[in-house]
Amino acid sequence: DMGNAYGIDIGTSNFKMCCSDKDKILNEKNIIAIANKTELLAFGDEAYEMYEKAPEHIEVSFPVKFGVIADIENMQTLLFNFFNKINEGKKITGSDFYIAVPTDVTEVEKRAFYELVVDSKVKAKNVYVVDKPVADAIGAGLDVTKSKGIMIVNIGAETTEISVLSLGGIVISKAVKIGGNKLDDCIISNVR
């Protein structure tokens, strides 16, 4: 089967994937359930149902922490399983992958996103790394090529990235380790 293009956004809490020839977007919890240390039990939303409820022999974990990949092996398993899910089990190889990565992370952390896809079982033809703020702006229908500055604020589960774009590039981008989870906690503690 001829390869398509896939866009991926790997977040701390959610994994999003879209495909150039389908108009659906896969958006599931970025979480995995492993039984007896080796056996894949569930992934995505199904694994999230088990989070904090599983017996001891089942490990349910999020492989991304603070916006960067903390557990490569489990993240590769998730990537492959989400890829199969969006393709409804059809064998597809030789596709192009565009992966949105945070800007305010180290080169090593950025490279980990690239290598994750390159080394995985999705058998990519090409892997392109796209700065998340630029992807966000384009996705929001903004013209990033203009000289007028655009400010993008991306609030994730554990990080918030604030960026200013101009002339197709990033002028400045800063990430802080506060996101939706922290906001939820603050609301909960104030409501009690």
Locate predicted features.
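Nucleotide/phosphate-binding catalytic cleft detector across ATP-hydrolyzing
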Residues: 1-155, 165-192
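Short glycine-rich anion-binding loops that position phosphate/pyrophosphate groups of nucleotides
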Residues: 158
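A structural feature that tracks compact, well-ordered secondary-structure segments
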Residues: 161-163
